[in-house]
Amino acid sequence: KHAWTEFNSVRKNWAYRVDQMTSTHPIAVEMEDLDAVRTNFDGISYAKGASVLQQLVAHVGRDNFIAGLRKYFAKHAYKNTELSDLITELEAACGKDLTAWVNTWLRTAGVNTLRPVIKLDGDKYASVSVKQEVPPLPVGSKELRPHRLYVGLFDVKGDALVRRESIEVDIAGELTEIKELAGKNAADLLLINDHDQTYAKLRFDDRSVETMKKYLGQLDDSLARGL
C-alpha cells in the first residue's frame, strides 16, 4: 500500500540529493569503459531513472506504455537493444514524437522547481499558474521540461486534512495557467504533483504552508504527506 511513499522518501530523495551536486549527469550517458560505469551508475541512473520512467508512463498513457513494451519485448527477444528501439515502439503505440521528451528528460541533467502562482478573488481562485524554474546545476542550464502531473486541492474538515479533488494537467515552459481552477473555492492546501507522477522540487503558497504547520499530521494519504 505504501510502496510509492517509501520510493519517494528513500529512493527519490536520493536522486534529488545527487542531482543537485556538481557531479550531476544525465540519465542516459555513453558508457565507454568500466570506469564510466562505476562513475555514472548512482542515484541518478537508478532513482531518477525510475522517477522519470514513471513520468514517461504518464506522458504516453499507461495502456500505450504497456502496449509499446509488449511489442518491444516481442520484437527484440534474445537480442541486444538500444534506447531508440524502446522509444520507437512507444511512439508507435501512443502516436507521439518523443524526440524532444527524450532529449530534455534523459540527455540533460538537473532538477526543476515548480511553484504555484495564485491570485485570489475573495475566497475563490481568480487564477492559478505553475511557475517552472531551471535547474541551478549544472550551471547555465536552460531546461524547462514538460510535466504531466496532478494538482491536488485539500481542505481542513474538522481535525482532518482531506483531498477535495485532484486535476491532471500538462505543464510546459516557464509559466502554465491551470484554467480548470479559476473560480473554484481556494483550498487550504494546494499540492503540485499530487500522486507524485513527475520529478521536480516543489514549493508552496503561504496559505498552504500555514495549513501544513497545523494539519500535516492529519493528512491520511501517506504519499501526499511525504510530498
PLM regions with names:
Residues L98-W101, V111-N193:
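Beta-strand-rich binding/interaction modules
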Residues D33, E82, G173, D205, ...:
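Alpha-helix initiation/capping motif
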Residues N13, G43, D123-S129, S141-E143, ...:
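Long, ordered, helix-rich scaffold segments
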Residues K75-T81, E91-A93, L161-E174, Q197-F204:
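Short, exposed beta-strand "edge-strand" segments with a Pro/Gly-rich flavor and a Y/T-containing core
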Residues A50, Y150-G152, M212-Y215:
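Short, surface-exposed linear patches
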Residues K1-G140:
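Hydrophobic alpha-helical and helix-loop surface patches within well-folded domains
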